[in-house]
Amino acid sequence: MSIRFESIEKLTELIKNKEIKPSDVVKDIYAAIEETDPTIKSFLALDKENAIKKAEELDELQAKDQMDGKLFGIPMGIKDNIITKDVETTCASKMLEGFVPIYESTVMNKLHDENAVLIGKLNMDEFAMGGSTETSYFKKTLNPFDHTAVPGGSSGGSAAAVAAGLVPFSLGSDTGGSIRQPASYCGVVGMKPTYGRVSRFGLVAFASSLDQIGPITRNVKDNALVLEAISGVDANDSTSAPVDDVDFTSDIGKDIKGLKIALPKEYLGEGVSEEVKTSVKEAVETLKSLGAEVDEVSLPNTKYGIPSYYVIASSEASANLARFDGIRYGYHSKEAQSLEELYKMSRSEGFGEEVKRRIFLGTFALSSGYYDAYYKKSQKVRTLIKNDFDKVFESYDVVVGPTAPTTAFNIGEEIDDPLTMYANDLLTTPVNLAGLPGISVPCGQSNGRPIGLQLIGKPFDEKTLYRVAYQFETQYNLHDAYENL
């Protein structure tokens, strides 16, 4: 039997009951990748030999009834900006082509402790800069629901692989929507946890005050299980939060009667397509039928999210990416005749167009004479956006709206128009700016392309988001659609 579309929960049950061996699961997954990924192009690197070896070691533990770990024998795919010891980590960039880390990221250590099995590294926008996975130096990933459409980005490979049944779960990173937007486009579940919930140690930095690692799965409960496994304070990350409550599954089945949900009028305003508005309005009616109270509210500074985000994120990126100088590691220009030339040529040849655009933008925003007008002002706007959310959360438990203003666009449609591409982040960037948790769950389709519903919660209240998402999923899901892709 093929297990490629089974849930983590079901696979765990089969393994615990000894109906299937971890090595059978892993081999089945590689067979699926061999069959499907030449078309989808979600993986950048596979770790097949080590994965099968690890799975066979787990077979022996299974035979002895020593099945420790929440994710015992469960295959996983990891976005290629998350450090994996002894497995190439490129950030989908020429700059890091061939870079093999000598240490492990915290999330990978946690997943290894739970006995999950690394299948391979997943494609992404270069250095997580992009919303379509088209800025990858190596390949363009396709949307499993429609091969003429992008999978979203920057975690496009992570979302596409899960939707196509190539792994039961993946990890992505979310700086301004990079987990939630591709989850929306690919019809899967993507969670951006509260800033500080998951350690960033071993995540190649894009914008350090915004980046957060999170899980992508085909259902809500699986997502909660993975977040339980990777959450927690870490001495290696001073921004990780000492929050003890990492139980997201015990209350997941509780009803949502009486829960107060806010629908910001700005989230169904200008720029949001009619089909997305219709699906979200239907989803709101579903939430009401489940017993939730939904009211319209205002988040007046929403429209300033994109300009504020792109100034702050680009500024932090220009500082973070200064470390790629062609000397210590990464691409090294062979033509340079001097130290200055080495810096210039290594960076101009090693980085792609979108990365260079954001470095230029960030360096300009931080430069003398412009710092106050751009960076400082953007930080003030960030505070206003956070204050808007704080005010709403005084009276409401959850904020609801679309994840993205449209369904997935066509490959090649927006890659030469950065402003149009950036506009897709309208509804996701405010969540990062405020440091809040946000989850995308499927809520509809238009012309075969999925639509995502975004649920936004109070800081460190992922538990409530999972409850609402789980109840909604009982009324609408794409579980039967995946196998027909």
Swiss-Prot record:
Q: Which domain of life is it from?
A: Bacteria
Q: Which reaction does it catalyse?
A: L-glutamyl-tRNA(Gln) + L-glutamine + ATP + H2O = L-glutaminyl-tRNA(Gln) + L-glutamate + ADP + phosphate + H(+)
Disulfide feature: none
Q: What class of enzyme is it?
A: ligase
Name the keywords, alphabetized: ATP-binding, Ligase, Nucleotide-binding, Protein biosynthesis
Single GO biological process annotation from the record: translation
Identify the GO cellular component terms for this protein: glutamyl-tRNA(Gln) amidotransferase complex
Q: Does the keyword Signal apply?
A: no
GO MF entries: ATP binding; glutaminyl-tRNA synthase (glutamine-hydrolyzing) activity
Instruction: Indicate the residues that form the catalytic site.
Output: 79, 154, 178
- EC no. given is 6.3.5.7
Record-linked PROSITE patterns:
AMIDASES
Q: What does this protein do?
A: Allows the formation of correctly charged Gln-tRNA(Gln) through the transamidation of misacylated Glu-tRNA(Gln) in organisms which lack glutaminyl-tRNA synthetase. The reaction takes place in the presence of glutamine and ATP through an activated gamma-phospho-Glu-tRNA(Gln).
Task: Provide the family line.
Answer: Belongs to the amidase family. GatA subfamily.
Share what the entry says about its subunit structure, partners included: Heterotrimer of A, B and C subunits.
HAMAP family, sorted: GatA
- List the protein's name: Glutamyl-tRNA(Gln) amidotransferase subunit A
Q: Corresponding gene?
A: gatA
